[in-house]
Amino acid sequence: MRKAKNAVVMQKQQYNINKLQKRLRRHVGQAIADYAMIEEGDRIMVCLSGGKDSYTLLEILRNLQQSAPVNFSLVAVNLDQKQPGFPAHVLPEYLAAQGVEYHIVTEDTYHIVKDKIPEGKTTCSLCSRLRRGILYRTATELGATRIALGHHQDDILQTLFLNMFYGGKLKGMPPKLMSDDGKHIVIRPLAYCREKDIARFAQARQFPIIPCNLCGSQPNLQRQVIGDMLRDWDKRYPGRSETLFRAMQNVVPSHLSDTHLFDFKGLMQGSAVVDGGDIAFDRESFPAQPAGWQDLMDDDLPVSSRNDNWTCSNCAEYAQSAPPTQQRKALTGPQARIAGAPVIPLATRHPPW
């Protein structure tokens, strides 16, 4: 009896892990499609720090390689900055075991930073600039056309609020941009992924995590404050973070105040009404629930009830790992089976990834 119960528990745990991986894969695929992050023949340099985010990024991209509509190659790159206690063997051993092409760059930026920054001060800014330059150079040497970073949705929102609260700017962290040297495209495929999902996935996969505080730098207190604020909102107002991110994708320049984005001086009597005109004092009709709630609801719907036409290449394995009740939901959806495999819809918007 106990063995049977344990088997059911393990089956449910595996089902939840598979479901989590599908969600991460879906979000990454959607971001890649929305921002045209990857094109045919791209060689993508995945910057691997040894943290949960970069491990997850690498695994999801490797997974997508199997079914992506374009061919692309991956090379994992780690920068050994000679920080005291850095376990230099961890990443090479992991990557070799996974069969991933990799390259380790060794540059003693640790002592450069320590010489320049007074004791007790945050070294992250100078360290990141040095690291960025080295990674750009490495990308050129390896023939990479894309540089993939592991920043996720929470990082992007934190950067937005940091710039708003402390810099007086509406500026975030773009999912895709040109590198400082003008030679490479930098992409953030995890832009739609939540940190809590990445943390759960990394724990389930038991990645060999390398601590991020080996340099001894003081934490960025401003970023900590913003992070605490967003986490508190997540607890008290589910869906708010998703709604905030959606707002970053729905900007109305004529209803802000930046003269560089909109020609306010060019507005004359008789001009056409722009973006609905003056509705500042109107009672706006907002939905009863934040827009971001739909994203959360989509993830909790039974797979058969989601409106999507994408056939997941791994749906048979996904359905088989589910508890019996979930298997029935997966196998009796409104869409027909193809080649004997159940069609499992994954999202309301779906890319060809």
From Swiss-Prot:
Binding site for [4Fe-4S] cluster: C124, C127, C215
Subcellular locations according to the entry: Cytoplasm
Requisite cofactors: Mg(2+); [4Fe-4S] cluster
Motif PP-loop motif positions after renumbering to this chain: 49-54
EC number: 2.8.1.-
Cellular component terms (Gene Ontology): cytoplasm
Note on cofactor: Binds 1 [4Fe-4S] cluster per subunit. The cluster is chelated by three Cys residues, the fourth Fe has a free coordination site that may bind a sulfur atom transferred from the persulfide of IscS.
Pathway(s) where this gene product acts: tRNA modification
GO molecular function terms attached to this record: 4 iron, 4 sulfur cluster binding; ATP binding; magnesium ion binding; sulfurtransferase activity; tRNA binding
Catalytic reactions of this protein: cytidine(32) in tRNA + S-sulfanyl-L-cysteinyl-[cysteine desulfurase] + AH2 + ATP = 2-thiocytidine(32) in tRNA + L-cysteinyl-[cysteine desulfurase] + A + AMP + diphosphate + H(+)
Enzyme class: transferase
Any one of the GO BP annotations: tRNA thio-modification
Other remarks in the entry: The thiolation reaction likely consists of two steps: a first activation step by ATP to form an adenylated intermediate of the target base of tRNA, and a second nucleophilic substitution step of the sulfur (S) atom supplied by the hydrosulfide attached to the Fe-S cluster.
General function of this protein: Catalyzes the ATP-dependent 2-thiolation of cytidine in position 32 of tRNA, to form 2-thiocytidine (s(2)C32). The sulfur atoms are provided by the cysteine/cysteine desulfurase (IscS) system.
PANTHER family: AMINOTRAN_5 DOMAIN-CONTAINING PROTEIN (PTHR43686:SF1), SULFURTRANSFERASE-RELATED (PTHR43686)
Cited NCBIfam families: PRK10696.1 (NF007972)
Quaternary data: Homodimer.
Full protein name: tRNA-cytidine(32) 2-sulfurtransferase
Organism field: Sodalis glossinidius (strain morsitans)
Classification of source organism: Bacteria, Pseudomonadati, Pseudomonadota, Gammaproteobacteria, Enterobacterales
